[in-house]
């Protein structure tokens, strides 16, 4: 009986310790928001195609072998390791869509570009895997 009385649900704990819970929850929300914008705004395939139709540039940050195996039409290949050195090849006045295989390497490239003053940076959520899964074409030039 004593053990049952000592058990406290998570909800009961949060309510009983609201003065600790609220700041902790605020910190979690702020952390998640900051992480979500790291390197650029995440966009869907649909949003990416809309931006591409409006003249956005596509930068594929995979290595050249991966790029040659299939990429979005009009994409420029600047591997993540070279992005700082070759940033002069990117037009700062146009929106930039960064792509990679799964959407996991693009944010680091985006951070590097942000450090160099680029503003309009977007990350293709799910990368080229998601692009291909939606039935959109990849070319091999």
Residue ranges of predicted features:
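Rhodanese-like catalytic fold shared by cysteine-dependent sulfurtransferases
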Residues: 2-45, 51-54, 64-95, 104-141
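Structural scaffold elements adjacent to functional motifs in cytosolic proteins
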Residues: 58-60
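Short, surface-exposed ligand- or partner-binding patches at beta-edge/loop junctions that are enriched
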Residues: 99
């Amino acid at each position: 009986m004593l053990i049952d009385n000592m058990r406290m649900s998570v909800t009961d704990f949060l309510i009983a310790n609201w003065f600790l819970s609220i700041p902790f929850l605020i910190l979690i929300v702020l952390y998640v928001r900051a992480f979500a914008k790291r390197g650029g705004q995440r966009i869907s395939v649909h949003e990416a195609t809309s931006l591409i139709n409006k003249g956005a540039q596509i930068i594929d940050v995979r290595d050249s072998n991966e790029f040659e195996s299939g990429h979005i039409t009009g994409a420029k290949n600047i591997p993540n390791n070279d992005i700082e050195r070759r940033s002069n090849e990117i037009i700062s006045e146009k929106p930039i869509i960064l792509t990679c295989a799964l959407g996991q390497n693009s944010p680091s490239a985006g951070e590097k570009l942000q450090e160099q003053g680029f503003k309009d940076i977007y990350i293709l959520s799910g990368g080229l895997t998601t692009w291909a899964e939606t039935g959109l074409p990849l070319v091999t030039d």
